[in-house]
Amino acid sequence: MASIDEGSRVERRFCAVGNHTLRKPYRQLNNKYLVRFACLLNSEIRAGNLICCKCYTDLVRLYRKKNDNAKRHKMARETAASITDVSGSQSSSHQSAPSLHVSGQSSEFGASYSEGGIVTPDEELCSHRSLSQDSDNVPTTSAAAIQKRQLARANLMVKPSQRLSLAQTTPDCDDYDPNSNLSLNAVNGTRLPHIQPIPKRRPTVLDKQSMDIYLMGTTGG
C-alpha cells in the first residue's frame, strides 16, 4: 500500500523545465548560471528544483551554444572597434602629414621671400624720405609742385594704412576736374526731371494805390 502511494506521488511531480511529469533519472538544478538561463524558459524556476536528466543535458547544450554565440559576437564587436580605431588613426595621420607639408612649404616660402627682399614699412618710409629729399633738392617755383611736396611730407608722418596716394591728394593730376563737384544746373543750365525750378519773387509795387488794390483782392477787403 505504501509503495502504491509512493508511485502515485512520484507521478504527480513535474519537471522544472518542461510541462511533463518528472522522469527517472532526475537531479536537482543547483548551478546558478543554469538557473539564470532556465529562468528565461520558466520564470518560476528556483535553485534546487528537480529536473529530468535528459532535460538537464538539453539545457546544458543550449546554454553552451548560447555562450559560444555570445563570445563570437563579442569578438566581432571588438574586431570592428579595433578596425575603426586603426582607420581613424590612419586618417588623422594622413590629415596631419599634408598640414605639416604645407606649413613647411609656407615657412620655406617665407624664408625665400625674405631672402629675396620683402619691403617692410620702415624701408618703404626710408624710400619715401629719400625720394622726398631728392625732390626737395630740385629747385622749383611751381605752386603745384610745392603743394605736392608738402602733401608728401604730411603723408609720411601718418600710419601706412591711413596714407593717401598722390593721385587722390594732389590737384594737378590728369584726372582732376575742377567742375566735378558742381551740379548740372551750374554747368549747363539743365535740371533733373523731379526737381522743379524755384519761381522768381514777384517785384514789390511801390505805388500805394496799386498796393491797396492788390491787398483788397488778396485779403477780401
UniProtKB/Swiss-Prot annotation:
Q: How does it assemble?
A: Component of the HipHop-HOAP telomere-capping complex, composed of at least HipHop and cav/HOAP, and may include Su(var)205/HP1; HipHop and cav/HOAP, but not Su(var)205, are interdependent for their protein stability. Interacts (via N-terminus) with cav/HOAP and Su(var)205/HP1. The HipHop-HOAP complex recruits the MTV complex, consisting of moi/modigliani, tea and ver/verrocchio, to telomeres to form the terminin telomere-capping complex.
Q: What is the protein name for this chain?
A: HP1-HOAP-interacting protein
Q: Where in the cell is it found?
A: Nucleus; Chromosome; Chromosome, Telomere
Keywords annotated in UniProt: Chromosome, Nucleus, Telomere
Q: What the protein does?
A: Part of the HipHop-HOAP complex that recruits the MTV complex to form the terminin telomere-capping complex, which binds to chromosome ends in a sequence-independent manner and prevents telomere fusion.
Q: Which organism is it from?
A: Drosophila melanogaster (Fruit fly)
Enumerate the residue ranges of region (Disordered): 69-113
Annotated Low complexity bias: 86-103
Keyword Repeat included in the entry's annotation:
no
